[in-house]
Regions:
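C-terminal segment of classical bacterial N-terminal signal peptides
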Residues: 9-15
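Carbohydrate-active catalytic/glycan-binding domains of CAZyme proteins
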Residues: 20-607
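Sec-dependent N-terminal signal peptides
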Residues: 1-6
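Local alpha-helix boundary/kink/capping signal
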Residues: 11, 61, 192, 630-635
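Short stretches within intrinsically disordered, low-complexity N-terminal or propeptide regions
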Residues: 7-9, 160, 683, 687
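Beta-rich interaction/scaffold domains
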Residues: 605-706
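N-terminal cationic leader/targeting segments used for protein routing and processing
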Residues: 15, 20-21, 676
């Protein structure tokens, strides 16, 4: 370890990294890439909270001929409300979907009164336009969904998918100009025109806009403005029937739905919000947040995405059903009915084809917290035919399993209830299972059940620490924590954006590791490690592959690593397999905190990544830095969780000089000292993640007074 010395930092170095990205000062090659340690689902770092993600694939502006997957979302950085001041974009090369790069806060808006607008769910589209010389040029229209007064319909334009973007339709009062039509949760679809006989052939495209909260509207947009209704056309309102719960239509009695296919039941659509449209073959598929659950035997929730399909971008539509229920639908213990294994709040997303694989993107709320939502993804299989919808053609979205004979996953109970949407897993883009020989935080678990089959509402905790890719899970007696799935069979060659990895062969002699901190001092604790299912029966075929026994007299509040030999059960196994941890105890109530788990082989010892710490003194006296950052609000406009602040009062005779030590060779820091006897000292600390070129910087402000 290298002991680093203190140094002065110039004021220009205190510009936040996020601000530099937005202003174009940080090159793409210098941006943070999430490539440290085990990665799963959520597919972005566990400290990052990007809900409402709209997935797109665009050509990489820095590598012509290569393509990147982009996720364009809002940003939960306020901690006490939805979203924040920026539209956030992350992207990854389509050939490696585990290398997500933070492209930064691509757009913010500060009003004339100095306050920052909050940005809700956005959309971004690419259009080919002519430049001044008549040559084709790619331009990008951002629909940021500002919540600022009279700015909901704001539209912005840029030359790159990662910005910067400039508003197009604001007047001198910073309000959207007359005719701007885009509303809540905007979605825009670009229909490319290749037919020379089409009246829009010269323009090359038609544009359609969709919006609405508990009410659905669609319209053709004016290609000249991209923010107003096309002259000579009228919006379709309502576009889809909206519901107040599953099957209960909320639109006014007598509403005529002109955009539904003949014979469609308005109660089957259940629109809530979050419109998004894609083309699949010769059909158009609308994804939206919609009430679901009773159609497969569960309670009604809007924590699900539904879909419908049509022959044209504005319908007439046929209902397709549920695309994903973020509550994680599974069989109950005896398989007689379905149940949920995860938390509910809301969700938002869409489908996107990347290479030859379709995915559905959505978000989850840790323990149901809607202010720290996380980006999730699942593979899907889409089946469609060439027959027009008007003649009986269909689109069907299935859960996807690469190891199933028909590549279809579904959960079907013996009572006949069947959930056919995407499976909620720990995998992310690791669709062949998580590479087993890595540490996986509790944040990558996808099953959180208590002994009664519900969810422990105090389980998965939020994380705002950009140096620490970890979430901790509080555990009660009887809780079940599950990971679906580990790729124990390995992957022999790169496939579908996943790099090849080793499985648990007999040469490895594999062990399994669990990190757990006991917080209760009463009784012993047993952690059963189950494979394939949490229960031993003919429905789940769960198999106990190990047991961890924690004695009643074991230390409290002491994080321990427990290792068991599981080679007998996992070595030379094929495919992917779920691992469940079942926490048993003689007493009810809280047991402790589960940190994470993973496999290791006989030649290596699995280590849990630990973030760096700074040892700070003022006038020779050690102080404790704040653990939680200053969160964003309308006044500070923070777009990240890098700002920390504290007050410190000097003791008599104590000098205000700040000194910093850190026993980490990959850490650099600078200190702006107080000018005089009191004032604000600033510590800027830059952490280089081991084995990578990715850095994250924190700024600590210490307000020193006598």
């Amino acid at each position: 370890m290298l002991l680093l010395a203190c140094a002065l930092v110039l004021s220009t170095q205190n510009i936040s990294a996020a601000k530099k990205v937005q202003e174009g000062q940080v090159k793409a090659s210098q941006r943070f890439v999430h490539n440290y340690g085990g990665r799963g689902n959520p597919y972005l770092p566990l400290w990052e909270h990007v809900p409402d993600g709209e997935p797109k694939v665009f050509e990489d502006p820095d590598r012509p001929g290569h393509y990147r997957a982009y996720i364009i979302g809002s940003h939960d950085v306020s901690a006490n409300r939805y979203c924040g001041p920026d539209i956030r974009i992350w992207s990854a090369p389509i050939e490696n979907l585990n290398e997500w790069r933070d492209d930064g806060p691509v757009f913010t808006f500060q009003a004339a009164n100095g306050r920052w607008d909050v940005m809700y769910a956005p959309d971004l589209v690419e259009v080919i336009e002519k430049d001044a010389k008549g040559k084709d040029k790619k331009v990008y229209y951002l629909y940021p969904h500002s919540r600022g007064p009279r700015r909901e319909a704001m539209v912005c334009k840029g030359d790159r998918p990662d910005g910067p973007f400039t508003p197009l339709n604001l007047d001198e009062n910073q309000a959207a100009i007359a005719g701007s039509c885009i509303g809540f949760d905007p979605s825009v679809f670009i229909e490319k025109i290749t037919d020379k006989d089409d009246p829009d052939y010269a323009k090359g495209f038609r544009a359609y806009g969709y919006w609405g909260f508990q009410h659905s509207t669609g319209a053709q947009l004016d290609q000249e403005t991209m923010y107003s209704v096309r002259p000579g056309t009228t919006p379709v309102d309502p576009l889809l029937p909206a519901s107040s719960s599953y099957g209960r239509v909320r639109d006014r009695q007598g509403t005529v739905y002109t955009a539904l296919a003949e014979g469609q039941d308005p109660g089957q659509f259940n629109f809530f919000e979050a419109s998004s449209i894609r083309q699949v073959g010769n059909k158009y598929v609308m994804i939206f947040s919609g009430y679901s659950g009773p159609d497969y035997g569960l309670g009604s929730t809007n924590s699900a995405l539904r879909y419908c399909y049509a022959d044209s971008p504005l319908g007439p539509w046929k209902s397709g059903g549920v695309a994903v229920d973020s509550r994680g639908v599974i069989l109950n213990e005896d398989g007689t009915k379905l149940m949920t294994s995860n938390f509910a709040h809301n969700t938002h997303g869409s489908i996107q084809q990347i290479g030859d694989q379709w995915y559905i993107f959505y978000h989850r709320p840790p323990r149901g917290n809607g202010n720290a939502r996380q980006a999730m993804v699942a593979p899907i299989k889409i089946e469609w035919d060439e027959k027009p919808v008007s003649e009986g053609g269909t689109v069907k979205i299935h859960g996807y399993d690469p190891y199933a004979p028909d590549e279809i996953w579904e959960a079907k109970a013996s009572n006949g209830d069947c959930y056919s949407g995407a499976e909620v897993t720990s995998e992310g883009f690791n669709i062949y299972g998580l590479p087993p020989y890595a540490y996986y935080s509790a944040g990558y678990a996808c099953v959180f059940m208590n002994k009664n089959g519900g969810q422990n509402r105090n389980s998965l905790q939020d994380n705002w620490d950009i140096w620490n890719n970890e979430q901790i899970c509080n555990v009660d007696a009887g809780d079940i924590i599950g990971y679906k799935y580990f790729g124990l069979g390995g992957l022999k060659k790169d496939s579908k954006g996943v790099e090849a990895f080793d499985g648990t062969t007999s040469k490895q002699h594999s062990s399994f590791n669990v990190w757990f901190k006991r917080t209760s001092g009463e009784g012993g604790i047993t952690i059963k490690v189950m494979m394939d299912g949490p229960w031993k029966n003919d429905v789940w075929n769960g198999k106990e592959i190990g047991k961890i026994k924690i004695p009643a007299n074991s230390p409290v509040n002491d994080l321990q690593k427990y290792t068991i030999d599981v080679s007998e059960f996992v070595d030379d196994i094929e495919g992917k397999h779920a691992i469940y941890l079942v926490f048993d105890a003689a007493v009810d109530g809280a047991l402790g905190q589960f940190y994470g788990c993973g496999f290791n082989n006989k030649t290596t010892s699995l280590k849990r990544p630990v973030p760096p710490t700074l040892n700070v003194k003022i006038g020779g006296k050690e102080i404790e830095l704040p653990a939680e950052p200053v969160h964003s609000n309308d006044n500070n406009g923070y777009t990240d969780n890098t700002h920390y602040e504290m007050d410190y009062k000097l003791e008599p005779g104590q000098k205000p000089r700040v000194s910093v030590e850190c026993l980490w060779s990959t850490m650099q820091f600078w200190v702006d000292q107080v000018k005089g006897d009191e004032g604000t000292a600033v510590i800027t600390a830059e952490y280089l993640f081991p084995g990578t070129t990715s850095k994250q910087t924190k700024v600590y402000k210490i307000n020193i007074s006598k």
